[in-house]
Amino acid sequence: MRFLRGFVFSLAFTLYKVTATAEIGSEINVENEAPPDGLSWEEWHMDHEHQLKDYTPETFFALHDIKKKGFLDENDILSLYGLNREEIVGAGDGMGQHDESEKIDNEMAKRVVSLIMRLLDVDDNTKITKEEYLQFAKRGNKFPDLGVGVGHHSDFELEYEIHHWNKFHKDKDPDVKVVHKEDIEHELLHHEHEIEHEEEIQRGASRATVITDDELESRIELKNIPEKFKNGIF
């Protein structure tokens, strides 16, 4: 994943960024997702994941203080950046091809937490209090793009519901009379993921085992795919 792509809060912070980048290293896999032009990572995250184009620092903090503790801890930061899981299935949002799936690099996740703590945890107690964050935001700062994508909070099934099902089917078309390509893409991803994990159990394979899309699709039982998702395609 591309790491530390571009967050410049000030000339001094630019110097800090260079140091941090060197410390992190270059062994991280490349992540292709990037904020749209004109948006910071934080703004991109809030728009894409929370459907909020306008928000206050108080709203941002409340949404990401998961247990309403009054501070952000390691788990909150991992959740914010979509790293609170063992693997990212497909593109992470319920879409994509199964070959795109990847395991979360635990060392990288630790470095993400460490960097964010160094930026915001003023008293160095491994907690980012609401006041610490509000002071950070008051200076015009925002959570930086660390090259790990938009920060999907949930697994690929729930992300599909959030970004597609709730928008197009939940109220308007609960019986899926209108099938979109996203519905079929997600259904295939779901079946491929199930097959891979069944194979891991049967073979005693490690989590690093990779099965190609062609192999997975050849084993999908079309009769198990609900008719509402076929729409004459299969």
Curated annotation (Swiss-Prot):
Residues of the signal peptide: 1-22
Gene: SSP120
Modification sites for Phosphothreonine: T212
GO MF, any single term: calcium ion binding
Ranges where the EF-hand domain occurs: 52-87, 108-143
Keywords, alphabetical: Phosphoprotein, Repeat, Signal
Keyword Repeat: yes
A Gene Ontology cellular-component term: fungal-type vacuole
Any further remark recorded for this protein: Present with 6900 molecules/cell in log phase SD medium.
Name listed for the protein in its UniProt record: Protein SSP120
InterPro entries: EF-hand-dom_pair (IPR011992), EF_hand_dom (IPR002048), Nucleobindin (IPR040250)
Tree of life domain: Eukaryota
